[in-house]
Amino acid sequence: MDPGECTCMSGGICICGDNCKCTTCNCKTCRKSCCPCCPPGCAKCAQGCICKGGSDKCSCCA
């Protein structure tokens, strides 16, 4: 499995580590994962963005 294409369940154990660049990884332990509310192509997506509640925006891709 490509470490940049992991698919973690929310709250599960993330196996991607700091190299996680997938858009479906919701693990809290994967600090550099993309959050599900991050739009495609967001350059800052892998910088620990956090989704703000039920909105479709996150802290780094407003």
Swiss-Prot record:
A divalent metal cation 1 binds at residues 6, 8, 22, 25. A divalent metal cation 2 binds at residues 8, 14, 16, 27. A divalent metal cation 4 binds at residues 34-35, 45, 49. A divalent metal cation 3 binds at residues 16, 20, 25, 30. Signal peptide: none annotated. Seems to bind zinc and copper. Could play a special role in regulating zinc metabolism during the differentiation of stratified epithelia. InterPro entries: Metalthion_dom_sf, Metalthion_dom_sf_vert, Metalthion_vert, Metalthion_vert_metal_BS. One of its GO terms (biological process) is cellular response to zinc ion. Gene3D superfamilies: Metallothionein Isoform II. This is Metallothionein-4. A divalent metal cation 7 binds at residues 51, 58, 60-61. A divalent metal cation 5 binds at residues 35, 37-38, 51. A divalent metal cation 6 binds at residues 38, 42, 45, 61. It comes from the Eukaryota. Belongs to the metallothionein superfamily. Type 1 family. The keyword Zinc applies. One of its GO terms (molecular function) is metal ion binding. GO terms for cellular component: cytoplasm; nucleus. Keywords: Copper, Metal-binding, Metal-thiolate cluster, Zinc.
